[in-house]
Amino acid sequence: MKIGYFVTACNEINELTRLLLMLKTNVSKSDCIGILLDEDNHTTEVKELCEKFLLPDNSIRMAYAPLNNDFATFKNVGYELLEDCDWIFQIDADELPSSTLMDNLHSILEMNPNVELILVPRINTVEGLTRQHIDKWRWKVNDEGWVNWPDYQGRIYKRSADIQWVGRVHEKIEGHKQVSMLPMHEQLALHHPKTIERQEQQNEYYETL
């Protein structure tokens, strides 16, 4: 079984650096990393960063595609980029998977042979978040400061022609027959830290779509 860790990115240089270093350290030798950059919206700095991580054996690879405000079509490029993989774990550039999940992912998949999609809990934190923001966006924030926990994300999916991303915005996986959810444990969650400035920028962008 081969898992492809599929990173989608634009110009998030600091976040992408952090993610790629983490993945390179923790990805199993039997797996690979695929990086997809928005060909119309990435900086030279981001391109050069990604190129530094590429390996001759293709275990870390990169491609370009236009986002064109269509997130599902963009993410479906991963099926070609990771054509030699059995499973895909899609991760946004500003997220971090847990090393515990990565260490145990092969075992989890092997113990659930009929599952085609796994929902992953996500810990969202926003530095600078105020009560005014929370009320405005109608968010739920727990005592740890996690926004909308467990905020399950469909990110680990079988590479199959029947299973595709759909939806230009707030895209999701469809075509799967059986889905499973990871437990709501911090050790298994995606981590998604942001600043309030970044959150406001993204909200403004989504409002234009």
Give, region by region, the residue ranges found by the protein language model.
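Histidine-centered beta-alpha loop that forms part of the nucleotide-sugar donor binding/catalytic region
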Residues: 10, 38, 122
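N-proximal low-complexity "stem/linker" segments adjacent to membrane-targeting elements
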Residues: 1-25
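Conserved acidic residues
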Residues: 3, 31, 86, 94, ...
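A short acidic, amphipathic alpha-helical/loop segment
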Residues: 18-22, 48-49, 77, 103-107
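Acidic donor-binding segment of Leloir-type glycosyltransferases
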Residues: 21-64
